[in-house]
Amino acid sequence: MSKPSVLKGCLESLVALEKTKRIPKKPSCDASPLISNFENWSGKPRKLYLRDARSMKRQGLPYELNSNMFAQLLASPMRLDKITRVRAPKELLVQIKLRKADTDISAARGKPFELRPSFGMERGHPTSYVSNSVALVHKYASSAMKWLPSSANSTIRHINQADVATQPEWYSQAYTEQMLGSLREALSSTLMHLGKAPESDPRDVIIVCNPQLPAISLRKSENPFIALATTVLNLYPIKDPELEKVVNNRDIELCSSKHRSLCFLIYRLLAFQADRII
């Protein structure tokens, strides 16, 4: 048999196979029962996953989590806490960056790199996370090298631990001052604009400076149709005269969704100093 006839026969066979190709049958269900009913056979509790906060209202669950400050904290992406080795929402942790050391530190210690906290959840530089607790950081300060970002030990970027300076003392000094400075500025700016325009959103957070109250508490809302409870954030345990002067013995009412960054900042500072407050 000649080559052209063999080639012709192969092409005819391929065409015949194409015509007789079976189309896969579409499953009767939209999602596999192994996914939709995972909790029934895995022994794990059911988890509720929603695409957006409004879907709860459509399903008859008016929890208003999109305007709940604590729900927003818990909804932040999960990260590994290098101290406790537990995954937690990153808004409840402190971001640590591996950076090139300042000139004076590099000259004094002979270490070209240092681990430093990042206040505003910055991008760039190798990153890790630790507990937002001054007590835990001081307790485990001797093992601070374990906080080194995993990417620092990759095959592309390998950094010797002997070249990294750790400064756990920043928790009680520079980092606290950085948070306090940002809080003073943010609170003063908010108060300047608070009364200039009418607030249409419900005010579900109250900032006070009261020695009689705990750092964080809940107060039953005067209007249950707007919010079941109001979160009270007490600045008194921080013991900062400038903040006390700004608050000036008054109750400052805020909307958590509108003043999200300020509410988060106060919560983080109170949680950071919680062991000292208690």
Curated annotation (Swiss-Prot):
Species of origin: Lachancea thermotolerans (strain ATCC 56472 / CBS 6340 / NRRL Y-8284)
InterPro entries: Rrg8
Protein name as catalogued: Required for respiratory growth protein 8, mitochondrial
Family as reported in the entry's similarity comment: Belongs to the RRG8 family.
Cystine pairings recorded for this chain: none
Compartments reported by the entry: Mitochondrion
GO CC list: mitochondrion
Keywords: Mitochondrion
Role of this protein: Required for respiratory activity and maintenance and expression of the mitochondrial genome.
A Pfam entry, by short name: RRG8
Entry keyword annotation includes Isomerase: no
Taxonomic placement: Eukaryota, Fungi, Dikarya, Ascomycota, Saccharomycotina
Any GO BP: mitochondrial genome maintenance
UniProt KW Ligase keyword: no
